[in-house]
């Protein structure tokens, strides 16, 4: 039946072609007229150019032609047909990208041509430029401008560079300044105005400022920045200085190293690296210190935190912050999140594990939030090669890529209308090895040997790890550049017998032999899996492997259990455990945010896990022949002595990290901190309060050890300072702080806050301030001091506590005197034995110096202050 349908369809198309040969001929001839226009522009032959246009528009086109070469100084051009519509045998419409360029600039226009066939030749009746004209530049150093000067001084906010007797190489752009290479003896002084950034600098360099001798500097800047922030004192004796070949080569080498790193994009038409011009006070200053090495100072008034100091030897952000605003100064902040929202994806990918090769097609629906939206911005792995990008009418779109920042810009032919959904399709492919995940993992052993039961060390080959996880960090599809939530339909094709698990519901599974569907597994060469998300997600993930379906529980929420090849034990009870955890969190956080939950256990080189929307991955280490599991070393977050820990932590991420995510890196704790807190509370509920002494003791020790690296609001930047510091602060310190907050508010009120916070921000990004606002609205308390101390500071309490016991009114009075070095707010638990029973009492410390009296019936003994180490810091 299928073959008969295909044959009929082929015959129909063949007849259509035979019956309408004129349309096919018209399409062929359209290419001829475009070629004629191209050749006439290349030869700068205005007469030949005008022959392609009707008499009514020749005068206008002659003016346009001459302006390009005479007024704008263009020297050559290239035309790229982006789409055509043959309306009839004698009428057609064509869209063309026209690229004009000279030695330093590029102009890109999109032409809409309406053509009419006269005397067997196509002629342009109307030509309109649609969309915005794109102007880009080809910056070069060295150019024909160089000079030796007496001094150069660059001063901006918190940085100052000075050079004496320096050699300056200017860029090739006429009538404005945008780039400069300075060679010579100089010095740099950088001192961040932000107190936390000073502290971080001191940790790295033992000083809260940087000072070094320089050998060169590379600058990109706006013309305004050049006039206001760069002072050049010229040397009258060296006005006609001619640099040597060695000096010229050095300038070119410096320029070639730094130029691709900022204000540059690779365009899709001729694949050349083109440059935008810095705007307002934008500036990039690269410099090489004799001791410090190569750094880049970046200032962008269009971002939340304008100043960024970056060290290239280890690709590390040293400082990033916003300087204090000067009086009367207004900050400008531009976000693509305000310009459009991604609403839906339809993605079709195939992955070949043996070759690590991925190919895909992504249809992306967006909703403009501004009038006349002319471009889109996505994140895409630069290892993936873009084949083409088309709009809803199949027309090829112009795009550019910033490979260093993994950013893709797509430009509409015609600007899109506000609130009217539109779509594009992106075709791409390339070799892509899934990157290693760094969050929620604990490093496993690197040497495959163990001391067996008889005391003999045995080495063995590492196992085959046959799972491939593509998640957010892989940027395997054109992802939103902001925190957009969207729905999606994903089709993944893999070689048989590999399988795929992804976000949402599996709605279709097909076995294939080449492109034909088969039913017999023995005939299958590949398998296709189709998933649909019923609820919004913030990113898409899929894992490929050879999985065993170990069962499911569909009593309330569908929960499924899979394990990968290499795992030889089923781990009974995991479905019931997952069910209990979900129920526990629903009571405290709110309804489970997705339609199903898949638990995927895989053999891997690290313990830990990962939690995309609607499924979680639990890593398990290899078991050696005597049943021993190779256990990883110390980690701040390892609570694996309780087997429920990892699954509880990863399931908590379905609420915190997935359904509610963080707005900026300052808010990372909303994901990892709340998930860790939830896991600890589940362990407490299952095993009793006794577990808190061990857990909080460990968390406090690690917090005290790593707190110096920064506050909770430093977020992901802590990883750059010390990976263990990130876990100690974001996971552990946050858990302790949230536990203190629960003690301050009361358990019922605290979980009411979490439920309301989750309800307000479900399927969206939230901030620390959003969390504080929710708490203060529900509790009626001002918690600014609490959050500043525990979330905004790297300091910890230093507390002197003295106590005394006196008889009073037939009983006893326990008196406490508390003195703090800094003002922290915290609940302080005191524990003692009274009449043979353990008693605990909480007092709220909210002043630097405080005294408390506790009335008792019996005499207290074995008095303990902060018994579970629930408050990190020094207690004397």
Identify the residue ranges that each predicted region occupies.
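Non-catalytic accessory/interaction domains
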Residues: 278-281, 287-337, 379, 467-469, ...
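Short solvent-exposed beta->alpha transition segments
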Residues: 31-39, 43-95, 769-773, 777, ...
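Extended, low-hydrophobicity, Ser/Thr/Pro/Gly-biased non-transmembrane segments
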Residues: 224-226, 231-336, 427-545, 867
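A surface-exposed beta-strand-loop module
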Residues: 136-149, 157-247, 254, 376, ...
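Exposed beta-sheet edge and beta->alpha loop/turn motif
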Residues: 74, 86-138
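A short, amphipathic edge element
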Residues: 67-93, 107-109, 338-344, 793-802
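Hydrophobic alpha-helical and helix-loop surface patches within well-folded domains
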Residues: 531, 561-817
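Hydrophobic helix-coil surface modules that form long, contiguous segments used
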Residues: 335-361, 367-370, 379-382, 387, ...
């Amino acid at each position: 039946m299928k073959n008969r349908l295909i044959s009929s369809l082929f015959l129909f198309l063949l007849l259509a072609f035979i019956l309408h040969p004129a349309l096919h001929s018209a399409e062929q001839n359209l290419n001829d007229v475009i070629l004629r226009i191209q050749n006439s522009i290349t030869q700068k032959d205005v007469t030949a150019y005008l022959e392609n246009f009707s008499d009514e528009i020749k005068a206008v086109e002659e003016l346009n032609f001459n302006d390009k070469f005479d007024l704008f100084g263009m020297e050559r051009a290239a035309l790229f047909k982006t789409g055509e519509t043959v309306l009839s045998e004698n009428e057609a419409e064509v869209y063309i990208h026209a690229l004009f360029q000279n030695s330093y600039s590029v102009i890109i226009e999109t032409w809409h041509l309406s053509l009419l066939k006269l005397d067997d030749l196509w002629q342009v009746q109307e030509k309109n430029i649609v969309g915005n004209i794109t102007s880009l530049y080809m910056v070069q150093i060295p150019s024909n401008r160089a000079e030796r000067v007496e001094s150069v001084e660059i001063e901006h906010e918190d940085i100052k560079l000075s050079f004496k007797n320096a050699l300056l190489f200017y860029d090739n752009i006429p009538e404005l300044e945008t780039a400069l290479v300075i060679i010579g003896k100089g010095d740099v002084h950088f001192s961040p105005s932000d107190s936390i950034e000073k502290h971080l600098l001191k940790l790295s360099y033992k000083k809260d400022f940087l000072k070094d001798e320089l050998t060169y500097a590379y600058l990109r800047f706006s013309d305004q920045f050049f006039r206001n922030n760069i002072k050049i004192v010229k040397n009258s004796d060296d006005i006609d200085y001619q640099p040597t070949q060695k000096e010229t080569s050095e300038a070119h080498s410096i320029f070639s190293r730094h130029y691709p790193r900022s204000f540059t994009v690779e365009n899709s038409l001729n694949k050349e690296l083109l440059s935008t011009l810095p705007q307002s006070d934008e500036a990039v200053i690269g410099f090489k210190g004799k001791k410090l090495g190569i750094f880049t100072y970046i200032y962008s008034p269009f971002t939340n935190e304008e100043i960024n100091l970056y060290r290239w030897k280890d690709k590390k952000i040293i400082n990033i912050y916003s300087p204090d605003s000067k009086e009367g100064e207004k900050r400008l902040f531009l976000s693509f999140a305000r310009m459009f929202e991604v609403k839906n994806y339809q993605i079709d990918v195939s992955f070949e594990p043996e070759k690590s090769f991925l190919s895909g097609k992504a249809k992306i629906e967006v909703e403009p939030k501004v009038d006349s939206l002319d471009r889109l911005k996505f994140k895409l792995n630069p290892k993936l090669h873009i084949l083409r990008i088309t709009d809803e009418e199949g027309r090829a779109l112009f795009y550019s890529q910033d490979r260093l920042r993994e950013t893709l810009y797509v430009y509409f032919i015609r600007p899109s209308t506000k609130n009217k959904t539109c779509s594009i399709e992106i075709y791409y492919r390339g070799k892509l090895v899934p990157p290693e995940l760094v969050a929620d993992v604990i490093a496993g052993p690197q040497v495959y040997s163990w001391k067996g039961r008889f005391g003999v060390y045995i080495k063995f080959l590492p196992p085959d790890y046959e799972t491939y996880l593509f998640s957010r960090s892989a940027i395997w599809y054109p992802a939103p550049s902001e925190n957009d939530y969207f729905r999606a339909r994903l089709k993944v094709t893999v070689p048989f017998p590999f399988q795929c698990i992804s976000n949402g519901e599996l709605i279709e599974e097909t076995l294939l032999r080449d492109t034909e569907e088969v039913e017999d597994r023995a005939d299958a060469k590949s398998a296709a899996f189709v998933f649909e998300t019923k609820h919004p997600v913030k990113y898409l993930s899929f894992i490929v492997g050879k999985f065993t379906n170990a069962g499911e529980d569909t009593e309330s929420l569908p929960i499924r259990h899979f394990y990968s090849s290499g795992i030889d034990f089923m781990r009974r009870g995991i479905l019931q455990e997952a069910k209990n955890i979900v129920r526990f969190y629903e009571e405290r956080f709110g309804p489970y945010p997705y339609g199903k939950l898949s638990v995927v256990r895989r053999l891997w080189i690290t313990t830990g896990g990962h939690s995309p929307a609607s499924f979680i991955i639990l890593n398990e280490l290899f078991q050696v022949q005597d049943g021993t599991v190779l256990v990883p070393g110390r980690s701040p977050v390892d609570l694996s002595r309780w087997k429920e820990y990892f699954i509880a932590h990863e399931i908590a991420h379905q609420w915190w990290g997935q359904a509610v995510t963080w707005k900026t890196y300052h808010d990372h704790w909303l994901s990892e901190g709340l998930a860790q807190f939830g896991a600890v509370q589940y362990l407490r509920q299952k095993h009793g309060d006794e577990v808190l002494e061990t857990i909080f003791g460990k968390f406090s020790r690690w917090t005290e050890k790593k707190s110096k690296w920064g506050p909770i609001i430093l977020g992901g930047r802590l990883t750059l300072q010390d990976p263990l510091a990130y876990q100690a602060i974001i996971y552990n310190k946050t858990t302790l702080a949230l536990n203190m907050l629960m003690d301050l508010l009361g358990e019922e009120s605290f979980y009411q806050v979490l439920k309301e916070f989750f309800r307000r921000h479900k399927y969206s990004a939230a901030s620390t301030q959003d969390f504080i606002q929710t708490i203060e609205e529900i509790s009626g308390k001002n918690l600014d001091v609490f959050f500043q101390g525990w979330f905004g500071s790297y300091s910890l309490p230093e507390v002197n506590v003295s106590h005394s016991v006196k008889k009073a009114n037939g009983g006893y009075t326990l008196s406490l005197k508390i003195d703090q070095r800094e003002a922290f707010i915290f609940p302080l638990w005191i524990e003692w034995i009274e009449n043979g029973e353990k008693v605990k009492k909480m007092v709220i410390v909210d002043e630097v110096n405080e005294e408390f009296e506790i009335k008792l019936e019996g005499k207290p003994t074995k008095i303990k202050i902060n018994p579970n180490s629930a408050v990190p810091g020094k207690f004397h």
